[in-house]
Amino acid sequence: KNYDQILSKDNFKPSEFSLDRDYFVLTLHRPINLTDENLKIIFDGISEFTSNYDILIPAHPRLRDYVNRNGIDTSKFKMINPQPYIKFLGLVHNSTLCLTDSGGLQEETTFLNKKCLTLREETERPITVEKGTNKVIGVNKNIISEINDSLNTKLTTYKEIELWDGKTSERIFEDFNDK
């Protein structure tokens, strides 16, 4: 049911976010990326793509506070408030590419079979890399080439990940009942 809501045209209206073309979703919230140095690398790199793509940033309060406090120019991007979960997944599902430092979004892009670049040096979700939807790229001067590589790479067809079948609560319930 939730997956159907994610895909529903009623849930996702590009005009609501002034999206006129294909777009990237960027989420940042980890303190390691909320520094002048790292934000400059990330924003400068992603800015290279604004002539062809909208950059949608559902801004975590920590990112918004940092940007406002430090007067960082985000005029090339569409910074929006955090969205309800299903609507956010609709944005992700309809995007061309996701860039994130969020572990949760790495999983969600894998489930939705969407390309994801992780702006960290490591991931707690290695299965997302193994399945080929996610690439850990860190934050460095190679961000432009990494985005280009991702845009020019076709994803393989999604194969269900063991235990990612929506039946976790049933397994937990059975486990409690067996004890």
Language model features by range: what are they?
Residues 1-36, 137:
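A nucleotide-sugar donor-handling region in carbohydrate enzymes
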Residues 2-8, 135-179:
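Leloir-type glycosyltransferase catalytic cores
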Residues 43-59:
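A conserved nucleotide-sugar
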Residues 49, 71-73, 90-91:
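Structural alpha-helical scaffold elements that stabilize or flank donor/cofactor-binding regions
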Residues 65-82:
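Nucleotide-activated donor-binding/catalytic signature segment of Leloir-type glycosyltransferases, i.e.
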Residues 80-91:
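Conserved active-site histidine-acidic residue motif and adjacent donor-binding/catalytic loop
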Residues 91-129:
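A donor-sugar binding/catalytic signature common to diverse glycosyltransferases
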Residues 117, 132-137:
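A short acidic/histidine/glycine-rich donor-binding loop in glycosyltransferase catalytic cores
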